[in-house]
Amino acid sequence: MANIVVKRLERTPIDEIPVEIVERKGIGHPDSICDGIAESVSVALCKMYKEKMGVVLHHNTDQVELVGGYAYLELGGGCMVSPIYILLSGRATMEVLDKETGKIIKLPVNTTAVNAARDYLKKALRNMDLEKDVVVDCRIGQGSVDLVEVFDRKRTEIPHANDTSFGVGHAPLSTTEKIVLETEKLLNSDALKAEIPAVGEDIKVMGLREGKKITLTIAMAAVDKYVNSCADYVNVKELAKAKVEENAKKYLDGHELEVCINTADDDEDCIFLTVTGTSAEMGDDGSVGRGNRANGLITPFRPMSMEATSGKNPITHIGKIYNILSNIIAEDVAKIEGVRECQIRILSQIGKPVTEPKILDIEMIPENGFELEELSPKAKEVAQKWLDNISEVTERIVSGNVTTF
């Protein structure tokens, strides 16, 4: 049995505190673009390694930088003047010694990485011309000797932690968290883009709850080729606002809602227009790990890890595995009858099996009529089950079935 500790969460339930702030950066935000590319590159490398070598080899591709380009904006359609520059860096296993033949096997790391980055951009930014609007530069290098050695030495056994670090998670999502998350998903959904094509992918949703009132302040890029006048632009905002308000009704749970879109606009002179759907075309830079946490949100009223989850290897890198695992455990613990709220923290120790954390800390707020003592064994059972099946978490990541930002 792992070192699992269960205790009462000594705080007011999140939905009852007077003020709550929640943020989500949409898939077209420069930071989220970097997160998405980093994770897509990692997943592609995992698949390439398994195809070529039968196992996932060591890599960390969590160092993606975006340098903003420059665009000439015009109602009815502008153009890019200077392309967005994206740098792929990090470390990956590029050569493997075949112990049976004694030959060095060279692996197509950089080709795989560039193709994955371009495929992701094509999927995420529908108005970007990949031939003209962006430059993808790959500078991924060979992995650290020490880290590769730890990875290779342990890969046929239980993976061992490559760092002393921690992951955190919480569940269930608060009303504000649900609305912020679902609002961005709505605005970047295929259905909404088909109905309102002028809505770009660079969307940021900031949620503020004061008592029973939730205010959403939304920054929403518009694509200039679909906007022929300022009146068109105002209409796009009004249509999007109506969609957000209608969608939010499913999650409001008695709260009042106010939706504000592009509050910096001066509808005569200053509006949020883009050519490609992202502010990365206008000098906004981006980096991995500066945006959403592993659960897709930025939650200053909850515990958060500063680790960038996207792009890290899914076998031994605690910054990835334990953050994702913490959220999975929290979600399952929160499903136990009598658990109102749950927070998870998992701490590793470098070189130790990932199934044996130094501590797995569970904090819970019981529902009225339930005692911590009766909930504790059930929560421990959930946590131990996931530690025993941690390879399932890795498989979800490698398959691309886990959200990391």
Swiss-Prot record:
Family, as annotated: Belongs to the AdoMet synthase 2 family.
UniProt xrefs under Pfam families: AdoMet_Synthase
MF (Gene Ontology): ATP binding; magnesium ion binding; methionine adenosyltransferase activity
EC number: 2.5.1.6
Lineage of the species this protein comes from: Archaea, Methanobacteriati, Methanobacteriota, Methanomada group, Methanococci
Keyword Transferase: yes
Reactions catalysed: L-methionine + ATP + H2O = S-adenosyl-L-methionine + phosphate + diphosphate
Pathway per the UniProt entry: Amino-acid biosynthesis; S-adenosyl-L-methionine biosynthesis; S-adenosyl-L-methionine from L-methionine: step 1/1
InterPro entries given in the database record: AdoMet_synthase_2_family, AdoMet_synthase_3, S-AdoMet_synthetase_arc
Protein name, entry field: S-adenosylmethionine synthase
Keyword Cell cycle: no
Organism name: Methanococcus maripaludis
Cofactor: Mg(2+)
Binding site for ATP: G141, Q142, G143, S144, V145, D146
